[in-house]
């Protein structure tokens, strides 16, 4: 249990409070037991440790054959054995009850103790843990609730053969007192355990959602260049190889890094991302490798860097081309033997971490210019993946635009269902210097500006409208303009035919085979147009 989970327990108060219940010889026998149990509870913040000792005291001093403590999981509405003596591990596993089921379930349901003078003859006896109704032993079984603020938290039960019925009554009273004494500890355990289980379940749910989200098949885009990227992700994800992701800003390099990690054997471990671009040299070292207490002004405590945080998982170094020569040198060592020292420290720190790096810079040119270490480049460039710019993924623009429209419609409480043909033409003819990130921003703006269920051309920013109207905004060559017009005509024909290649070819006056060749050249897939049916 955490240090914050504490409670006040007055040993003398409990002993004095319960002392009136016993007289004479019984009092002499029972009060030392109560006092001993109260000391056990006071000195143990851990429920399992405390219960184990309490049950041991019951077994030693009360000659009980079996002792059982159950806890009530209100979320699952089940009662389970938390600790016991006289039961095997297999028997403990079988001790799971619903509320109202068997003697234990009835005690939790009613909040009242049950005494079975002859256990095997009691109508609620289930025999789930050991004994059967046909057994010869005439053991009594008594089960009392563990309660706190009128809420049943669990039960404590015992089994023993009694020759004197008066002793049974005294033991039931004693067990009731023990239940009262352990109730605060049980309550704190349940509160913390429920929260821990909730967080664990939430963590599992989020990790599963991330794994589903970052499946290569869930990345939007069916163009040939992206199919090649998916194939590379599939091949490298299951390995421990260092990956270098190349591509312009906004193409989705971080998405590729996520897909690799969440489809790897280390998917359950951490993925730690560090953006190297905005960090000055001294902060970059501390960010990546951590620092020791007092290593510089303001270093009041030891700090673990990204590499230590990612131990057992993956670190994603975004914009790795921006690192200073000093940090580059330290990174070479990490790549070589997975060891480093924190800033201000001399003790080597060893980590087991997979490295994925990304950059929009031309590292080969930087190596030639002497601004990027050659040995670092070759250690990073084990398995390069180049993410194509959006202008080379013609058919993906429509699929991505539709995805963003749906997402931003939900986010903004709108009901935008489609993009008009003129608006689609503008999206297809634009060269997207900001790539997918720019398209995302454009579609968010368009959804916000839309007054009905359609994205119109006038909902798009002026830069797209100007480019479509003039056809010269990009400074394209004649050949590039001809290709753009040809691509636009093919897209329009496929939209009109709902992706049917034969009908589109007929509309364009081309043979089906020739249209297929041109579609492959421009990376256009007929599947992207089936929604127009």
From Swiss-Prot:
> Which InterPro entries would you find in this protein's record?
AAA+_ATPase (IPR003593), GAF (IPR003018), GAF-like_dom_sf (IPR029016), Homeodomain-like_sf (IPR009057), HTH_Fis (IPR002197), P-loop_NTPase (IPR027417), Sigma_54_int (IPR002078), Sigma_54_int_dom_ATP-bd_1 (IPR025662)
Annotated region (A domain) at 33-193
Could you say which residues bind ATP here? 247-254, 310-319
Instruction: Enumerate the UniProt keywords alphabetically.
Output: Activator, ATP-binding, DNA-binding, Nitrogen fixation, Nucleotide-binding, Transcription, Transcription regulation, Two-component regulatory system
Q: Has UniProt tagged this entry with the keyword Transferase?
A: no
Give start and end of each Sigma-54 factor interaction domain.
Answer: 219-448
DNA-binding region residues: the ranges are 501-520
UniProt cross-references to Gene3D superfamilies, sorted A to Z = 1.10.8.60, 3.30.450.40, Homeodomain-like (1.10.10.60), P-loop containing nucleotide triphosphate hydrolases (3.40.50.300)
A single GO molecular-function term is: sequence-specific DNA binding
Q: List the disulfide bonds.
A: none
Q: Which GO terms describe its biological process?
A: nitrogen fixation; phosphorelay signal transduction system; regulation of DNA-templated transcription
List, for all copies, the residue spans of the domain called GAF: 46-186
Q: Would the keyword 4Fe-4S turn up in this protein's UniProt record?
A: no
Q: What does this protein do?
A: AnfA is essential for nitrogen fixation under Mo- and V-deficient conditions. It is required for the regulation of nitrogenase 3 transcription. Interacts with sigma-54.
Question: What name appears for this protein in its UniProt entry?
Answer: Nitrogen fixation protein AnfA
The organism named in the record is Azotobacter vinelandii
The major lineage groups are: Bacteria, Pseudomonadati, Pseudomonadota, Gammaproteobacteria, Pseudomonadales
């Amino acid at each position: 249990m955490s240090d914050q989970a504490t409670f006040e327990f007055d040993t003398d108060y409990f002993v004095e409070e319960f002392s009136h219940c016993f007289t004479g010889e019984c009092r002499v026998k029972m009060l030392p037991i109560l006092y001993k149990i109260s000391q056990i509870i006071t000195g143990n913040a851990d429920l399992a440790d405390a219960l184990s000792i309490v049950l041991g005291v019951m077994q030693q001093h009360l000659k009980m054959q079996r002792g059982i403590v159950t806890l009530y999981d209100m979320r699952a509405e089940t009662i389970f054995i938390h600790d016991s003596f006289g039961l095997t591990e297999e028997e403990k596993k079988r001790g799971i009850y619903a509320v109202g089921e068997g003697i234990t379930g009835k005690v939790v349901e009613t909040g009242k103790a049950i005494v079975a003078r002859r256990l095997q003859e009691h109508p609620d006896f289930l025999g789930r843990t050991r004994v059967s109704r046909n057994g010869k032993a005439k053991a009594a079984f008594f089960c009392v609730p563990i309660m706190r603020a009128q809420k049943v938290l669990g039960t404590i039960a015992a089994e023993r053969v009694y020759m004197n019925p008066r002793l049974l009554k005294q033991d039931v009273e004693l067990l009731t007192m023990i239940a009262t004494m352990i109730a605060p500890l049980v309550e704190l355990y349940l509160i913390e355990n429920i929260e821990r289980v909730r967080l664990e379940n939430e963590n599992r749910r989020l990790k599963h959602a991330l794994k589903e989200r970052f499946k290569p098949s869930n990345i939007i885009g069916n163009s040939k260049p992206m199919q090649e990227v998916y194939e590379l992700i599939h091949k490298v994800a299951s390995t421990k190889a260092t990956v270098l992701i190349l591509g312009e800003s906004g193409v989705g390099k971080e998405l590729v890094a996520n897909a690799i990690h969440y489809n790897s054997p280390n998917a359950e471990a951490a993925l730690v991302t560090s953006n190297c671009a905005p960090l000055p040299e001294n902060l970059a070292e501390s960010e990546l490798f951590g620092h020791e207490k007092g290593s510089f002004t303001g270093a009041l405590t030891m700090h673990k860097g990204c590499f230590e945080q990612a131990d057992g998982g993956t670190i994603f170094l975004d914009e790795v081309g921006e690192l200073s020569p000093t940090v580059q040198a330290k990174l070479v060592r990490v790549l070589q033997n997975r060891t480093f020292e924190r800033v201000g420290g001399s003790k080597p720190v060893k980590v087991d971490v997979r490295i994925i790096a990304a950059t929009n810079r031309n590292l080969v040119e930087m190596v030639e210019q002497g601004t990027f270490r050659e040995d670092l480049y070759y250690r990073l460039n084990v398995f390069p993946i180049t993410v194509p710019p959006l202008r080379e993924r013609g058919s993906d623009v429509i699929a991505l635009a539709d995805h963003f429209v749906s997402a931003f419609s939900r986010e903004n409480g709108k009901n935008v269902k489609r993009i008009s043909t003129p608006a689609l033409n503008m999206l297809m003819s634009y060269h997207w210097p900001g790539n997918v990130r720019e398209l995302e921003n454009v579609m968010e703006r368009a959804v916000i500006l839309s007054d009905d269920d359609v994205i119109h051309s006038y909902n798009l920013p002026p830069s797209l409208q100007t480019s479509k109207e003039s056809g010269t905004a990009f400074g394209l060559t004649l050949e590039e303009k001809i290709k753009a017009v040809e691509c636009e005509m093919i897209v329009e024909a496929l939209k009109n035919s709902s992706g049917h290649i034969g009908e589109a070819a007929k509309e364009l006056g081309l043979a089906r085979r020739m249209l297929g060749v041109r579609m492959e050249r421009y990376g256009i897939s007929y599947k992207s147009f089936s929604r127009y049916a």
